[in-house]
Amino acid sequence: MKRIEKYLLLLIVIAISLFTLLVITNKTRYLDYKIFVMIHNIIKYNDINMVKLISDLSVILGILLSSLMALYFSKKMFLKNIINIIFAYVLNFCIKICFCIPRPSWKLTSAVGYSYPSAHTMLALVVYGNIIYLTNTFIKQRVIRIIICMLSVFMIILTGLSRIYLGVHYASDVIGAYIIALIYLLGINYFYETSNNSRKIMKNNVK
């Protein structure tokens, strides 16, 4: 990881720390509700069950696609993909337990567990982020890369919006999930890069 990337990661960590402080002190609630109302004013769609289905399937589809892509290109990448997903889920669970923030009072469907950060959103960014990484690493055709990356970004945004629309998460839960997932991906990639470099150095020393 280059020095500028380390500074960027540090700034993002500081930003999410400050943002989380605003969330746990209820400083974002007014804006959260305004965003909830705004989304419902823009997206006038009343089939809550369909939105919930889209919200759930977007993550399941992402897990399946990222796993199949990773398995196709490299068994090692498949293992990393599974580890990334499991660790992301565990990280989300730990943060939820740490802050114990209840879900919005205006939720339109049932949901269990705590609110911050959104697990669906975190997992969506992780799995579709993995798809983007695999696409840029292994697929050579530029047009196909662009299409897959654009669809992946669309699914990441759609998942977050669906959670806010359903009222099962505050907008701040979704924003926080995006930032935390981004930090997680940067951190895990740095770990993999460092591990690979260490192995190469050890092999060279043995030779």
Positions of the model-derived regions?
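Hydrophobic alpha-helical transmembrane segments
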Residues: 21-23, 67-73, 163-164
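Aromatic-anchored segments of alpha-helical transmembrane domains
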Residues: 16-21, 88-95, 154-164
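N-terminal transmembrane-helix/juxtamembrane module of multi-pass inner/ER membrane proteins
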Residues: 1-61, 97-99, 103-108
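Alpha-helical transmembrane spans of integral membrane proteins, capturing the lipid-embedded, hydrophobic core
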Residues: 11-15, 81, 85-89, 93, ...
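Membrane-interface loops
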Residues: 29, 61, 71-141, 145-147
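Hydrophobic, aromatic-rich alpha-helical transmembrane segments
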Residues: 3-4, 49, 74, 78, ...
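Hydrophobic, membrane-inserted alpha-helices
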Residues: 15, 61-70, 132, 155-160
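Membrane-embedded catalytic cores of phosphoryl/pyrophosphoryl-handling enzymes
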Residues: 108-207
